Amino acid sequence: VGNYAVVKDSWRGKEVNYYVEPEYGPVAKKIFGNTPEMMTYFSKLTGVDYPWIKYSQMTARDYVAGAMENTTATLHQEFAQQDARELTDENRWEGTIAHELFHHWFGDYVTAESWSHLTVNESFADYSQTLWFEYKYGKDAGDAENYWGMRAYLQGDNTKKDLVRFYYSDREDMFDAVSYQKGGRILHMLRNYLGDSAFFKGLNLYLTTNKFKSAEAHHLRLALEEVSGKDLTWYFNQWYFGSGHPKLNINYSYQQEKKQAMVVVKQTQNTGKIFRIPTYIDIYHGKNKSRNMVWIENAIDTFYFTSETKPDLINFDSDKVLLAEKTENKNLDNYIHQYYHSGNYMDRREAVDFCGRKIEEPKAKALLLDAFADSFHGIRGLAISKIDLKKETQREVFEKKIASLVATEKNRPVKASMLTALGNTNNKEYSIIYLPLVNDSSYTVAGAALAALEIVDSAKAIDIAKAFSKQTLKKRLNTVVTTILTKYGDEQMFDFVASTYGKLNIQSSEKFEMTMPFAQLLIKTTDPVKFKKGIDLIVEFREAIPQGYRVQTDPYFNFKILGDIIKAKKQKGETELVAMVTAVLPKM
């Protein structure tokens, strides 16, 4: 219940509506406007037209989940709402919009028969994000989405959890990176193994056979087996009814006397489990490639390939789809060849990562310079992130190139990364680049420009920050303005900074970034009422973080943020304020 702007759209004669708070009415179609195209794409992909009479999407304040796929009426948290300047960077909610829509096939049309099989809902919804980005923005974008999903799984403590879990403490435990991101990556591998035709025809059979009913992982297996003609029992036993993932050590060598390339793959996971893995190994001589399908089935597998000369590159998992941790003995020349000739997103990403670690090598520098002009913004941004222009050996190679690219870079986050890199030069000449960009339509670019300007002309940056403080600010510009006013201001800035901090969404990175500057302002604050309000805001943020993350975040809040405030206040002899902070720390 609330005051909403209702923005109407349609798909094949069916109502498609977007409910947003009135101020977001003018940009509702920029947020949700790809929905009809998604409906067309997912209908074609599954072979099942969107099966419901209408589709509405609405936002709500303080919603406990990110979003929920209520049939025909998806509810999104308020973080979905973005103004025009935020959308200049990207639509941060586009993946979630695709995710919840795809649930109308996998979750609503066919529903998981129990919490244990939740992944047949959530893995498909998660994977829909990869599918959508691949379709809409190209294979690199889809591969990047897939990579970040794999990272989310690998970074957590998830190796002991089966994808289908019959034992769990609470049903909420099932909503994790295993059911979602790991499940999505397992589908990606399965698609690669079966091929697109069999995979998507299998999904169609699964949906049409089980429509308006409940189903489990075995129903999915049977549908895919019927269409593909392949036995998938081993795959489902390994990935759906098992836990963990392979850790692979891959060693490449060449035996000149035998004219033979050798690949040794060792599984090093300490679980007692050996994975069965179909994959491809590509062997390159210049631009020429030979492809070889192999099966990894033992603790150590060795493969031999006839090769008249030493290969320029041997590329294991050449489609880059395996859910695995890999260690390879490739050298710089191998990765350079991989970047220019293998070509998919992960091939290029791996090469840029390696060159970042070998950045003092001339060949690595040359590749990074080329990567600044990569066709995909994700690779351009990654290459920029490897550069530290505080170091003279890097400045002399990269500085002028980055400065020349700022004006022509179309992707706003990459442009912002370039500005941040230039800021590290402490070169006053770049003020002519920074000053116009503090008014850029992108909050991210404007914030990066203002932060860089503050390094070379703090007085000018302070004046601009004061002027901006009277406007509605978000994202990085908000953080930078607040940081500058906190750094150079005094207690008089408390009301503005506290108000800004309190309004930030707890899911935004800006809230974390602002916590330290806000704490520094509280160190300067002597008014007990204002000081307590500030401490309460920090504690409110600490307590609002989901319980599963607090083992990581609580030490930061308690020992770094609040601990630093206590230390500073003790040095100043402000015992009353020390007591206020001590009272909100956990009892030891």
PLM region spans:
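Structural detector for internal amphipathic alpha-helices that build alpha-solenoid repeat scaffolds
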Residues: 320-324, 347-359, 370, 380-393, ...
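Beta-strand-rich binding/interaction modules
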Residues: 232-233, 243-317
